Amino acid sequence: MKIIIREAKIIDPSSSFHNKVVDVKINDTIIEKIGKNISSEADYEEINHADLHLSQGWFDSSVSLGEPGYEDRETIANGLNVAAKSGFTGVALQPNTFPILDNQSQIQFVQQKANHLATDVFPIGAFTKNSEGTDLAELFDMKNSGAIAYGDYGKAISNANLLKIGLQYVQDFDALIIAFCQDEKIKGSGVVNEGIVSTRLGLKGIPNLAEELMVARNLFLLEYTGGKLHIPTISTTKSVALIREAKNKGLQVTCSVAVHNLVLTDEKLDGFDTRYKVSPPLRTNFDRIALIKGVLDNTIDVITSDHNPIDIEHKKMEFDLAKNGTIGLESAFGALLTVLPLDKIVEKLTAGRAIFKLKSNSIAEGNLANLTLFTTENDWTFSKENILSKSKNSAFLDTKMKGKAIGIYNKGTLILA
């Protein structure tokens, strides 16, 4: 494919064209030329759009799709099409499928299903067999098959010794462990953040302590073993402080935060709407502000949509019984623009590649074209009728947004929303 993207503002600090409005000429997979008023050519398609911006392709570090096993929630093909039209050229795929992605053949299955699609999929292998927290999965074999990290999605590694052994073992092949932090004993039967809102609604609460105890424990283990650790979707003030302190001590720890935890609070729960039932739970505004500060000072390395499609049968039920999760790919950018400056959003939507040791390409002549196209001034409402995901469980339903992904260019393919 040959295209010329017209008058796009480049948002890429690693590029000499950062913050400049230019034309970008692309021949198949390579950026051929960047400059003003590039001459039209008969065999080049031209892309024109008001308020057009261009950045390195966005990468989401936590996406669940369902397939294999839960295709009623989402398929790989449709899910990656949704990702592309939401601006993501790459996603890290969680292992919470059926069967769990805990061996070489399951990793290969996912890659084979996705290799012809424009958005790249990078599987995360389960840390333990069947994500049951008892025995290590086939970590080395999965690494050789393309797994970029290991984690049991939404489940803490409760066995401290197992995490210690894992942290030591994967150093032999320079791999990364993802450790979700929530002490199940402290959480108990809690379903929302413990606080004024949970008391008012009569719902059982999950104290911040449930997360913070596990964060502190895992950081102690990392200090003992060395190696690298990624802590996903943190949600509390103290978690930010603990990770900031660990980084200052020189520990190789990275972390992420989910879009909904940056934008929403537990005040949304007043209507008992299960769309707001997520894990970790929506916290207070005090925590939300601490998370934003953590993003701004780079304590928090990446922002994820934590996209988790859930079918209506498991959402439209009593709050205590409903499953956790919200879809997030389609609303991520528009929601983030309400709380963060543009440059920081793009930074945090592209930084995940470095954490997972994936190649990134500056916007420069001769480089691979892995690009996201977006606007910042497009007013729109995230309505159910416009959702492309098979599941509609969005915490941002009917939210007014400003700014939207237009599409991507990756692997010689243009996908427009």
PLM feature spans:
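His/Asp/Glu-enriched, well-ordered alpha-helical/loop segment
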Residues: R200-G226, D297-F374
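C-terminal cap of metal-dependent C-N hydrolases
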Residues: L321, L368-A417
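N-terminal metal-binding scaffold of metallo-dependent hydrolase/deaminase domains
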Residues: M1-E41, T413-L414
